[in-house]
């Protein structure tokens, strides 16, 4: 089962989204819906906490890429935090590690988005 949860953090001027489980084709549809809803609010800073993400397929990766591009067009920034070795390998294999700011912790990701 795949879930996307918004994490409340009053100390951060942005949004933290936690992805959990297996983001296969069905999960990619859930992710697409959540990201569409999130985009409507025009956030400027978004951290995706991937610690509990076990798998993400190409459709899910495509949703993150599209969200990132849309946010950047509007001056926003995206960072990934706590990315597992397997997910990081998939991003690197897809040559997406240059597109996303990847950080060891949520705190590091938040700090990186606050710069600039």
Predicted features along the sequence, with ranges:
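A short, charged, amphipathic alpha-helix used as a generic interaction element across diverse proteins
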Residues: 109, 113-116
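Short beta-strand/loop segment at the start of cytosolic alpha/beta domains
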Residues: 1-18
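Amphipathic alpha-helical interaction surfaces in cytosolic regulatory modules
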Residues: 22-100
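Conserved catalytic submotifs in the C-terminal HATPase_c
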Residues: 11, 51, 107
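Residues at the C-termini of beta-strands that transition into short coil/loop
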Residues: 20, 106
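Acidic phosphotransfer microenvironment of two-component signaling modules
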Residues: 85, 107-108
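Short acidic-hydrophobic, aromatic-tinged amphipathic segments that line or gate anion-handling sites
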Residues: 101-105
